[in-house]
Regions:
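Conserved Switch II/interswitch segment of TRAFAC-class P-loop GTPases
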Residues: 148-149, 155-160, 170-192, 202-221
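Conserved catalytic-core segments of large NTP-driven translation/proteostasis enzymes
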Residues: 48-51, 60, 229-400
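C-terminal effector modules of nucleic-acid-centric enzymes and ribosome-associated factors
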Residues: 31, 67-70, 214-217, 363-487
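P-loop NTPase switch module centered on the Walker A-proximal segment
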Residues: 20, 27, 31-163, 172
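Long, basic/Gly/Ser/Thr-rich N-terminal segments
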Residues: 2-36
């Protein structure tokens, strides 16, 4: 029976008694025996992190090294495009299947290849994450060259799920902006999603003009002109506009081509690791015998550093509760990494980029039902402080962009008010936050009380939204200047 001893250990116990236990050579061979068509990883590859890149063959064989977001208005084809490229249906929850829309962040990996013999766009192919590194071209029989291994972060487009979209934006390296050609452009969440990724300093945006199978050529040209006018003056002004039908996989090769030509993100492999948790779950099926229980799993992405199988890690903030006086108290979690996976691919280590599942030796109850969403994982004692409040240099948008008619009769975004409650996105978590102080010459330095507390890094970009009706609407962004009370 698994004993979840790490829950009861203090930081001193972990650092004093528990050490990293790397797997043996025999264990490594056993780990990779199920996927012999992929590269065998070795700790020697990462012994000098300054010499590795996101395109290092041993890394790219098993792990995605870029995160691509799919953004845009509801029902414009984001999930369908991800399925057309990766072969994976990202809507897996019951409510999503019943209503045929995305409610939660969806995830899928894809390997992107080029055939050295096939002409033009026909040379570009996409397969699942478990495909071998040099498969034969189905058209000509030549061996394909692996160019990229990417993870899709499929964001919901419904207006009431804007906070979920912002959580996904925190881990994106680039974005596909889906625009349905059979609707007037822009739609409300087309505007709002583009504004969100711009605020998060995302530079690489590809515009995809979807559903061209539903309209005639003249209508497609008119919609194209609307898209050009909409993108003018934004970070997407020079972005390619790719006409496709995701449903029929028409011109998908063009999307793959542009994905393969995105700039390689600059990664920090040297600093202590910082892993952003965007989901957590219990992988045990109901009725599993106690001796067969597996520990909890967290999923997310590394923004810097490297994590290895067998390492001791800390999760902050861990268990959050309130004392008798109503004040928040936090018990950070410590555990050993017992598995690293990306979809079905086993990993010996994980590097920045791509979505990773980290198996831990903690009670699976703690990770069930997304209980650890928004947490940070890393080496003990190396993570940012937990703050009960933060001070932010704010930048307000001039108007609400996520409401109907915002282009013609847009509502002005009013100034932030004392005691107002806004929704702040810090990393991958959304926090209801009360304004407790406003200062600065332009009244743009705001202190927020976080409820509950969260990890934040000085200089980190945060987004904030205001409640309008039943939905949170994006109103601005800012940089964390300082933390307030630590916990």
């Amino acid at each position: 029976m698994i004993k979840y001893i790490y829950l009861k250990m203090t930081e001193k116990d972990i650092l004093g008694k528990e050490k990293t236990i790397l797997p043996s050579e025999e264990e490594i061979q056993q780990l990779f025996s199920k996927s012999k068509n992929l590269a065998i990883q070795s700790f020697s590859t990462i012994s000098d992190p300054s010499k590795i890149t996101p395109l290092t063959p041993e890394i790219m064989s098993r792990q995605a090294t870029m995160n691509i977001g799919t953004i845009g208005h509801v029902a414009h084809g984001k999930t369908t495009l991800v399925r057309a490229i990766s072969g994976i249906q990202t809507t897996k929850h019951k409510i999503e299947k019943e209503r045929n829309i995305t409610y939660y962040l969806g995830y899928a990996n894809a390997k992107l290849y080029k055939c050295p013999k096939c002409p033009d766009l026909d040379a570009y192919k996409a397969y699942g994450s478990g495909m071998e590194d040099s498969p034969k071209c189905e058209t000509c029989g030549e061996k394909l060259e692996l160019l990229r291994h990417i993870s899709f972060v499929d964001c919901p487009g419904h207006d009431i799920l804007m906070a979920t979209m912002l959580n996904g934006a925190s881990v994106m390296d680039a974005a596909l902006l889906l625009i349905a050609s059979n609707m007037e452009c822009p739609q409300p969440q087309t505007r709002e999603h583009l504004a969100a990724v711009e605020n998060m300093d995302l530079e690489n945006i590809i515009i995809v003009q979807n559903k061209i199978d539903l309209i005639k050529e003249d209508a497609a040209k008119e919609n194209y002109n609307q898209i050009k006018a909409f993108a003018k003056g934004t970070k997407a002004a020079k972005s390619p506009i790719i006409p496709i039908s995701a449903q029929y996989k028409y011109n998908i090769e063009a999307v793959i081509y542009y994905l393969c030509n995105l700039p390689i993100p600059k990664r920090d492999f040297v600093s202590p690791p910082r892993f952003i948790v965007i989901r957590s779950f219990d992988i045990n099926k109901p009725g599993t015998e106690a001796e067969n229980l597996q520990g909890g799993v967290v999923g997310g992405t590394l923004v810097r550093g490297i994590i290895r199988l067998g390492e001791i890690v800390e999760i902050k903030p861990g268990i959050i509760s309130k004392n008798e006086e109503g004040k928040y108290i936090v018990q950070n979690l410590y555990s050993r990494i017992v598995s690293l996976k990306t979809e079905t691919n086993d990993l010996l280590y994980a590097v920045p980029g791509g979505l990773i599942g980290v198996g831990l030796k903690v009670d699976p109850f703690l990770t069930s039902k997304s209980k650890l969403n928004g947490r940070i994982l890393g080496h003990p004692g190396k993570l940012p402080d937990i703050y009960a409040s933060i001070v932010v240099k704010t930048h307000l948008m001039s108007r609400y962009v996520g409401t109907k008619g915002a282009d013609k009769n847009s509502s002005h975004v009013g100034e932030i008010k004392f005691k107002e409650v806004l929704l702040i996105n810090v990393g991958s978590t959304s926090i209801a936050s009360e304004v407790v102080d406003i200062s600065g010459e332009n009244r743009d330095v705001v202190k927020f009380r976080l409820s509950p507390p969260a990890c934040a890094e000085i200089g980190e970009t945060v987004a904030f939204s205001r409640k309008l009706g039943h939905s949170w609407r994006l109103i601005g962004w800012g940089k964390v200047l300082e933390g307030g009370e630590t916990i």
